[in-house]
């Protein structure tokens, strides 16, 4: 797995600029709604990452649309193009369930994977670029950061790409997660993490082990792309996101201890927010326009109090927006789809392809094609998708087709559904399952149903009827017509010879 080298976000931006993948905007643009409008138009056109050098009212530039194309996501993961992300998935599958070499030849084949593992340990620094400037106490003022307001109905400016660092009591490994954070004061943000996410679980354990004590939290803004992407990739529970970022980058992730707590943050981050959550302190969060294309409900989440802001000289603020696909999360989903395939195939070798259509909000609907081997096989695969990776916990619909269907072609998939399914026999409904809190269509917040569609050819035991045979053309006739096609001149507005 060849790795595209860069050390930090600034290195990566230089790389993008050299390849025509970064546009500097010198015209003053307002972080209130205007940057979103420009970024949205650019993303939909497949355009470059955008660096707004003069956001109105601020001296700090804003980076947007960084992961606006699958190619840039692949570059962030150290690869030349999206197809190479299958190799990242194979590496993750190997790390999830490593197998000892079966012999010398197998050892030689696995050698590149073992060499990459050498980049997993973090490198701890005494001082770091992210601590070149330090502000604390009453001098902390989040309003100096050009935090974007993305949609007209949004409650307040919103931090979107904050890499939140937490740790459970008596644990060495840290958790990295991306959670949006609503600005509610000069030193206060609302930490919107769902109850099953790593940060929330760390907080729950802390509260149980240390009643009444403040929970330390740090948030890195403008971390290097490998570290950001490591936080949204299905990394095995035994592997830290920093370690995985080192694998992607090809160099050890450099970290530094925070000024006010023992958490370790990316040494090259542009900005770091340090602080705590006071147990029991919550605030109503939202509404905000979300990746579903709707404003979400208002709900209460913990308040993050910022005690220190550390940053690099001439720091860059990295931001994005979320809305009805396509948006950056949808583009990330398209790229990460390629990472998921080898992981699923290692557990279920019968899977030929797996596809999360971006118009399905990146994860709410999945299409799986399989080499069917027995009656009921499709139902086993449905259950496997829902249970194997936590990323698919909220997938509402799973469609399973045979391997003669292209999972990424709706014409093929709809044909399979309408010709190979009996709705009563081939539909699986599972009630009272975990559902995305943002899914207002579910009857209860966080709890709803799932549907599996078995659009495979039916085997004996699944049907008593003679099954239809697909129409296939005569290859000799096809070859003959190919040979005389130009002479027919059907589309040339002329006469055949």
Swiss-Prot record:
Its cofactor is prenylated FMN; Mn(2+). It is a peripheral membrane protein. Its EC number is 4.1.1.98. It catalyses: a 4-hydroxy-3-(all-trans-polyprenyl)benzoate + H(+) = a 2-(all-trans-polyprenyl)phenol + CO2. It comes from the Bacteria. The keyword Flavoprotein applies. GO terms for molecular function: 3-octaprenyl-4-hydroxybenzoate carboxy-lyase activity; metal ion binding. Prenylated FMN binds at residues 178-180, 192-194, 197-198. Pfam families: UbiD (PF01977), UbiD_C (PF20696), UbiD_N (PF20695). Homohexamer. This is 3-octaprenyl-4-hydroxybenzoate carboxy-lyase. It comes from Shigella dysenteriae serotype 1 (strain Sd197).
